[in-house]
C-alpha cells in the first residue's frame, strides 16, 4: 500500500472536525433530485404494522396495539403482527428501552400483508447457521499497520458534528440533512478514487424523507463478494410523538457507531487500502422506528441475488459503564454463528494481546440492523459498548455525558479495522501464515 499525500491526510482531518452548522448549509444544496424518490412524512394517525416477539407483546406491547396475529418464523420463534397508529411508535421504543432494557425490538411495515409476508419469507435459520465463507485470519501485517492509526480525536469530532443537529429523526429535515452530510463526508475521504463511490439509497417506501448512505470500495479481485460494515444514522427521543423538531442529539445512539465506521473508512482511504472483495460502508435510515432502512437494503440485495459474505453492525460504541472492565460486548443472538466465531478469533488475535477483554450477551428480537440481514438469510454480527447507556433516547444522549471523549470507541474501531481487512482481504498481498485461534478470552455476562 502506498502512503497518502500529507495534504490528503490533513484534508481528511479537517473534514472530520467540521461542524454541521457549516455542513448543513452544504448538505442542503443540490440533493433534491437524489431524494425525490423518498416519501413525505407519514400520517401520525395512519396504522403501522409491527412484528415483535410474542413475549414482548404479552409483557407490554399489547397495551399500545389493537389487532394481532401470531406467526412463526424459520427459527420457530413465535412472533406477533400488531397494528398501532404511527405516533405510538415512540411509546413502543420507550417501552423497549425502559422495560426490557434494550433498543429496537420490532420491524415496522405499512400493511399487515407486508408484515405477514416478511415472517413467512424469513430466512433467519439460514442467516444464523450457514457458513457463507472461509474466515481465515492471514492479514496480520496489514492489520497491525492500520490498527494503531485509529484516532480518538477523529471519532470524537464526528460524534460532536452529528450530535449537534437538533435531531436526526427519519421524518425531519434534520434527519435528511444529516444523511446527506455523512454521504458528502465519506465521499470526501475517498479523495476521488475511481474504485470508490458514495450514494444515497432512497428505495425505501417507509423511510419518510431520510435516505440511507452507502459507500462502496469495489473489490479488485472478488468484486461480487461483498463485505458490509454499517450503523444507523437516525436518532429519536422517547415521548416526542414524532415531533420533527424534537431534541434528540443521539451522541451514543448512534452517532458513535457512524463515527466509528467513519474512522475505519478514513484509515482505509488514507493508506490506499484496496481490498480483494467489495466493501460497503452503510449508514441506515429509520432504524429507531422499526429497522426500515436496513431492511430495505437487505431486501434489495436479496432480490438482486447479491453475495454478501459478512455484515458487521456498530450500534452504540462510546459509553463505558462504571465498573465495567470489558472493551466491548459481542451480541450472541440473531447473528451468524460462524461469523461470531470469526469475531472471537479476531479479538483473540488482535485485541487480547493488547490487554482488552470482551463479554457476550443476547439483545433480543430485532434489536438493531444486523437483524434485518439475518432475517433475509445473510450472515451478520454485532458488537457494542456493553451495558446500555442510561440516557439513550433522551436529550442527555450527549458526548459530555460520556466523559467528553471517544476513548471507549477506539478499541471497537480497531476491531472493525481487523474485520474489514481480514474479511475483505488485500489486493496483491502475500498472506501471513494462518493462526490457530486461541480460546475466547471474554467472560459471557447476562443480557442487557
Task: Report the location of each language-model feature.
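N-terminal hydrophobic or amphipathic helices/low-complexity stretches enriched
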Residues: 115-172
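Solvent-exposed loop/turn segments at secondary-structure junctions
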Residues: 167-170, 203-208, 219-222, 233-237, ...
Amino acid at each position: 500500500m502506498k502512503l497518502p499525500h500529507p495534504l490528503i491526510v490533513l484534508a481528511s482531518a479537517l473534514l472530520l472536525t467540521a461542524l454541521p452548522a457549516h455542513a448543513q448549509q452544504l448538505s442542503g444544496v443540490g440533493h433534491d433530485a437524489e431524494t425525490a424518490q423518498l416519501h413525505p412524512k407519514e400520517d401520525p394517525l395512519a396504522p403501522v404494522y409491527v412484528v415483535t416477539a410474542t413475549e414482548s407483546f404479552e409483557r407490554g406491547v399489547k397495551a399500545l396495539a389493537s389487532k394481532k396475529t401470531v406467526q412463526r418464523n424459520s427459527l420457530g420463534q413465535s412472533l406477533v403482527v400488531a397494528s398501532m397508529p404511527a405516533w405510538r411508535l415512540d411509546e413502543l421504543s420507550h417501552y423497549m428501552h425502559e422495560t426490557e432494557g434494550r433498543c429496537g425490538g420490532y420491524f415496522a411495515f405499512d400493511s399487515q400483508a407486508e408484515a405477514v409476508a416478511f415472517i413467512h419469507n424469513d430466512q433467519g435459520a439460514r442467516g444464523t447457521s450457514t457458513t457463507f465463507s472461509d474466515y481465515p485470519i492471514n492479514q496480520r501485517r496489514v492489520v497491525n499497520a492500520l490498527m494503531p492509526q485509529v484516532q480518538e480525536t477523529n471519532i470524537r469530532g464526528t460524534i460532536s458534528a452529528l450530535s449537534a443537529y437538533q435531531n436526526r429523526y427519519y421524518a425531519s429535515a434534520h434527519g435528511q440533512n444529516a444523511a446527506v452530510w455523512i454521504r458528502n463526508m465519506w465521499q470526501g475521504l475517498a479523495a476521488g478514487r475511481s474504485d470508490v463511490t458514495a450514494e444515497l439509497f432512497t428505495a425505501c417506501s417507509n423511510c419518510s424523507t431520510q435516505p440511507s448512505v452507502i459507500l462502496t470500495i469495489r473489490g479488485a479481485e472478488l468484486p461480487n463478494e461483498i463485505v458490509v460494515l454499517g450503523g444507523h444514522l437516525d436518532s429519536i427521543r422517547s415521548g416526542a410523538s414524532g415531533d420533527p423538531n424534537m431534541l434528540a442529539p443521539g451522541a451514543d445512539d448512534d452517532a458513535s457507531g457512524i463515527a466509528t465506521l467513519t474512522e475505519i473508512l478514513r484509515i482505509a482511504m488514507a493508506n490506499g487500502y484496496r481490498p480483494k472483495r467489495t466493501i460497503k460502508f452503510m449508514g441506515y435510515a429509520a432504524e429507531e422506528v422499526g429497522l426500515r432502512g436496513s431492511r430495505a437494503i437487505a431486501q434489495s440485495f436479496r432480490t438482486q441475488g447479491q453475495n454478501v459474505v459478512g455484515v458487521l453492525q456498530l450500534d452504540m460504541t462510546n459509553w463505558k459503564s462504571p465498573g465495567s472492565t470489558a472493551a466491548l460486548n459481542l451480541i450472541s443472538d440473531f447473528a451468524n454463528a460462524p461469523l461470531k466465531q470469526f469475531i472471537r478469533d479476531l479479538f483473540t488475535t488482535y485485541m487480547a494481546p493488547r490487554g482488552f477483554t470482551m463479554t457476550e450477551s443476547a439483545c433480543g428480537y430485532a434489536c438493531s440492523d444486523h437483524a434485518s440481514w439475518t432475517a433475509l438469510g445473510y450472515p451478520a454480527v454485532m458488537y457494542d459498548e456493553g451495558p446500555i447507556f442510561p440516557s439513550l433516547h433522551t436529550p442527555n444522549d450527549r458526548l459530555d455525558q460520556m466523559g467528553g471523549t471517544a476513548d471507549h470507541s477506539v478499541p471497537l474501531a480497531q476491531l472493525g479495522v481487523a474485520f474489514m481487512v481480514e474479511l475483505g482481504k488485500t489486493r496483491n498481498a502475500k498472506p501471513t501464515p494462518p493462526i490457530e485461534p486461541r480460546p475466547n478470552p471474554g467472560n459471557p455476562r447476562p443480557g442487557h
